[in-house]
């Protein structure tokens, strides 16, 4: 598979781990899973691994920032060993990107940065694109895009351009911040059955 990817000149820029870091009783599983992801990422020449510090897209319950900081410092040692960077997604309580910045500042390791899911800070923390960029700045190494509207107080995911996220403003802010990384359409049909099939979207 690795040789096929190289022959086709295809790159896998980011692996998405499924573990959630906030659960203290999952500590050993998190260490094991991230280690396995880091080994695979090195084999694939994949620079990034997405990690979830909180579980849900929206804030739901509290998270122990101090515990997460210490855990990320441990995980950073693993990431550095395999020359990959862990990207904490802007979801859950970390939709508040000031809080995420404070966490990343405390970790203070170049092998831990941010994945900006454009949806969650805008939708759940009422942040403008400018605020998110000002908060995270060069911590942003990878971007997930999706679109939605609110119906009866609930998020309803839509095709890009059919929601009300300020996508053009977001892309403009990234450009002004000299972002030159990947922008990935995250199609959440797994959690929103009404969405069109990926074949239609792509």
What is each of the regions a protein language model found here?
Residues 17, 90-91, 146, 186:
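Active-site-proximal beta-strand/loop segments in catalytic clefts of secreted hydrolases
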Residues 8, 45, 97-116, 121-202:
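Histidine-acidic metal/acid-base catalytic patches
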Residues 18-21, 149:
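Active-site/binding-pocket entry motifs
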Residues 4-14, 21-114, 123:
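Active-site acidic/histidine proton-transfer and metal-coordination neighborhood
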């Amino acid at each position: 598979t690795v040789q096929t990817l190289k022959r086709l000149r295809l790159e896998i820029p980011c692996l998405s781990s499924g573990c959630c870091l906030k659960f203290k009783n999952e500590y050993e599983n998190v260490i094991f899973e991230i280690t396995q992801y880091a080994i695979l990422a090195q084999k694939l020449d994949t620079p990034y691994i997405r990690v979830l510090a909180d579980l849900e897209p929206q804030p739901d319950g509290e998270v122990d920032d101090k515990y997460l900081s210490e855990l990320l410092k441990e995980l950073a040692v693993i990431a550095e060993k395999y020359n990959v960077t862990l990207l904490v997604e802007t979801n859950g309580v970390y939709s508040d990107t000031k809080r995420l910045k404070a966490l990343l500042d405390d970790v203070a390791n170049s092998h831990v940065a941010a994945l900006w899911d454009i949806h969650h800070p805008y939708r759940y923390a009422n942040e403008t694109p400018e605020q998110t960029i000002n908060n995270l700045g060069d911590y942003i190494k990878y971007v997930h895009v999706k679109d939605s509207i609110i119906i009866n107080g609930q998020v309803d995911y839509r095709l890009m351009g059919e929601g009300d996220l300020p996508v053009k403003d977001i892309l403009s802010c990234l450009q002004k911040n000299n972002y030159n990384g990947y922008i990935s359409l995250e199609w959440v049909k797994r959690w929103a059955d009404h969405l069109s099939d990926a074949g239609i979207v792509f």
